[in-house]
Amino acid sequence: MREEHYRSYSAVFPILLREGAQGQEVLLHLRQNTGYMDGSWDFAGSGHVDENETARQAAARECREELGIAVAPADVEFLHLCHRVSGGDGRTYYDLCFLIRKYTGTPTVMEPEKNAGLRWFPVSALPENISSAVEAMLPCCLRGIPYSEYFNDKPVKL
């Protein structure tokens, strides 16, 4: 008899960083019309891993589809994994953050129905209306912390 296991989801969060006038900057997009955290600044190019696709391939695909930039999967560098149990629907997610250093093209809004704009923000001066993903995972990515857990919209303290 085969035992069924719960279903989990995987999402990728490309992290695009650059040096700006005020130090390191991160590229964020303003969510709209998605039904999830609309009106919040979120990691630009984030999305789900599709069937028969690796996480690196998904990050490269999402960058192409949502930002119009070309990224080779070999240039996608692992930064952080967050095991997240969503407070809203109880879904379990494995959120993978990847550093994107090398890409071709200029980040552009490719899905204006879901993305109200792109903007580079100094990591030391993020807007107040950031997504829970940015709030939870960006500090880990910047500090070199490879793993975290998030349960019902709160970080798990060990």
How does the language model describe each region?
Residues 24-65:
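Conserved Nudix-box catalytic region and its N-terminal flanking loop in Nudix hydrolases
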Residues 1-27, 99:
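Conserved N-terminal beta-strand and adjoining loop/helix that marks the start
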Residues 99, 109-142:
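NUDIX/MutT-family hydrolases
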Residues 9, 38-44, 73, 91-95, ...:
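Short connector loops at helix/strand junctions that flank enzyme active sites
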Residues 139-158:
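Charged phosphate-binding loop/patch that engages nucleotide di/tri-phosphates or the phosphate backbone
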Residues 9, 20, 82-107, 140-141:
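Active-site-adjacent beta-strand/loop module that shapes the phosphate/pyrophosphate-binding cleft
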